[in-house]
């Protein structure tokens, strides 16, 4: 088991990860810290995991479990409000902690709920997917969707604790693990990775890994993200690099209406971003090939069931949540691009490069 102190400027919290880490929550949280725990989880999280978490938090204070319907279409303010009303009915107060047990969907919904209640009560993350454990909990961004796009309403709110049980993560369906591995590969592509404790040979297309391997991967992702975000807590400057692949990826994810995972969408988004950078003479061909090679190592580009047409993808693309960071005319869209593996492309001292919409459409129409 590993414990890391994660700091966003002066906002610090402990992140404990490893096998059976939930059985050790008593050693991290003082018994009198909270008077009750409101455990929030979406319907896609197995009951066995939720009750397993509740068993150990229940040794500290009473636990109430609130479930909501899973799916991106339920990642909304109305879902948040419903959960808050139910929490208040259970006696939630300023000494209540919200415990998010689930993936990124649950983490964001619970994060927004916690940040708004009583102008902010304690938030604890228990990520149950490798994607959440290695990516979304390593950020203080909390947001929900509008009908026009992903993560358009939200704020910055740090958790008090994070507990990731790698035994639970290792027993996840391979496709779910692959979703997180796509974000790990993103970190390998966007940053120089001289100190990682694994090699490309440790990656596999079956996406079956031991708890110890996943612990190593999480440790790498923590180092990668905090090397940047410790100084850019709002992810508006250097931290924008972690949005690589997300401009087109989020649009694909929305257009597919739940048909593909977030990781699969980001994998496709990174390939399209690499091809766009190559067409703009920013990225050499061999670095585009490196994208394909790494993503194929984890089987990310195999059998992705893409069904949406380019026009529907572009409909969501123009509502990307990074709009407004730089001034653009109506013919261009800002994108995070690379000039090579580990080399973010810069434009006027920012990480957002204007890209002609016609070029984006052209690359999307070509496909993978």
Swiss-Prot record:
Active site, renumbered: 141, 243
SUPFAM superfamilies referenced in this protein's UniProt entry, alphabetically: Dehydroquinate synthase-like
Pathway it works in: Metabolic intermediate biosynthesis; 2-deoxystreptamine biosynthesis; 2-deoxystreptamine from D-glucose 6-phosphate: step 1/4; Antibiotic biosynthesis; butirosin biosynthesis
InterPro entries, per database record: Dehydroquinate_synthase, DHQ_synth_fam, DHQS/DOIS_N, DHQS_C
Residue sites binding NAD(+) per the record: 42, 72-75, 104-108, 128-129, 139-141, 150-151, 176
Sequence positions that bind Co(2+): 183, 246, 262
GO process terms (BP): antibiotic biosynthetic process; aromatic amino acid family biosynthetic process
Top-level class of the enzyme under EC nomenclature: lyase
Temperature dependence: Optimum temperature is 46 degrees Celsius.
Pfam families assigned: DHQ_synthase, DHQS_C
CDD domains tied to this protein: DOIS
Sample GO molecular function, one term: metal ion binding
Cofactor note (record): Binds 1 Co(2+) ion per subunit.
Subunit structure comment from the entry: Was isolated as a heterodimeric enzyme comprising of BtrC and a smaller polypeptide further identified as PdxT by sequence homology. Homodimer in solution.
Protein name per its UniProtKB record: 2-deoxy-scyllo-inosose synthase
Organism: Niallia circulans
High-level lineage: Bacteria, Bacillati, Bacillota, Bacilli, Bacillales
